């Protein structure tokens, strides 16, 4: 089975008035939840971060009123910003976040290290 990645954004959005427009969303908290179930055991990891959206050069003709926003739209802005920041050398892309979660879950399923009792230790002191 493969790792399932689910992106979301918090429903608590930071807004401000800008360029004559009200309730401009300028900051959101995104979350990436990833999981895989193997032989009935579910392995998971979650990451989240607050990100500032680029609100430069807002166009009133294409501006979406706060009441009309959808989670998919705001999530798209967040993911676009994550990728744009990575392109400028700040952080990693969405695909790299997912790949990191893949690696983490693979290590949970097959730990690269183990804890073993030393050979000189005995069960009966």
Predicted feature locations:
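Acidic, low-complexity intrinsically disordered segments
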Residues: 57-125
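Short, charged/polar N-terminal "headpieces" of proteins
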Residues: 1-44
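A short, structured beta-strand/loop element
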Residues: 31-64
């Amino acid at each position: 089975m493969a790792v399932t990645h689910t992106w979301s954004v918090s429903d608590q959005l930071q807004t401000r008035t800008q360029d004559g427009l009200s309730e401009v969303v300028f900051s959101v908290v995104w979350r990436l939840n990833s999981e895989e179930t193997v032989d009935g055991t579910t392995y998971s990891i979650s990451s989240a971060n607050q990100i500032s959206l680029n609100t430069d050069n807002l166009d009133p003709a294409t501006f979406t009123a706060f009441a009309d926003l959808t989670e998919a739209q705001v999530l798209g802005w967040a993911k676009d910003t994550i990728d744009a920041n990575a392109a400028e050398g700040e952080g990693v892309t969405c695909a790299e976040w997912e790949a990191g979660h893949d690696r983490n879950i693979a290590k949970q399923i097959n730990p690269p290290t183990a804890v073993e009792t030393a050979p000189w230790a005995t069960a009966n002191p």
